């Protein structure tokens, strides 16, 4: 946090610059992965990995950092699928400010790259060339629900902001 905060807020305090903190964080993360029982979740498909980490019906037997242990057999699961897909569940949606925190694929800040044009940019342009986790967090052009064949855009009857969450949404046999 300290490194990225200093980098994106232009803070230069005495001591170390932002690169020092980012390098220290990377070293600490590598130590945890190399020496601990944990590993990063990966199916070797970065366009789906982030979404699938949160959408599994049953917990993996592997030790992952940031994993939630759901078990369909033990009836330990969430209701996020229905919550994000049904209009009777409060119509959740992320704010534009939150969506703008997702970086571009090249690592640059979205709002820095597009200065003021981002404020009137069409949705399809706004989500183009972003960190792949954005398309695994909200419905973007080309979105297909897990196990479905039909492409679905954001359902404005279900999300009040237009940024419809898909994180935790499971396949079509789940509720919703």
Identify the meaning behind each predicted range:
Residues 152-176:
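Active-site beta-strand/loop architecture of penicillin-binding DD-peptidases
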Residues 2-160:
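An aromatic- and glycine-enriched ligand-binding surface/loop that stacks and positions planar moieties
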């Amino acid at each position: 946090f300290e490194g990225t905060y200093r980098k994106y807020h232009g803070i230069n305090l005495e001591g170390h610059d932002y690169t020092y903190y980012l390098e220290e964080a990377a070293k600490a993360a590598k130590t945890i992965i190399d020496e601990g029982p944990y590993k990063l979740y990966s199916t070797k498909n970065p366009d789906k990995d982030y979404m699938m980490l949160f959408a599994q019906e049953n917990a993996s037997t592997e030790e992952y950092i940031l994993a939630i242990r759901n078990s369909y057999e033990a009836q330990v699961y969430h209701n996020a699928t229905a919550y994000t897909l049904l209009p009777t569940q409060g119509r959740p949606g992320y704010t534009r400010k939150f969506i703008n925190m997702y970086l571009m694929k090249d690592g640059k800040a979205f709002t820095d790259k597009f200065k003021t044009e981002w404020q009137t940019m069409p949705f399809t342009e706004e989500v183009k060339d972003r960190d792949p986790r954005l398309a695994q967090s909200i419905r973007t052009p080309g979105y297909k629900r897990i196990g479905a064949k039909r492409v679905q855009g954001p359902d404005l009857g279900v999300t009040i902001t237009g940024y419809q969450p898909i994180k935790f949404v499971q396949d079509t046999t789940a509720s919703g």
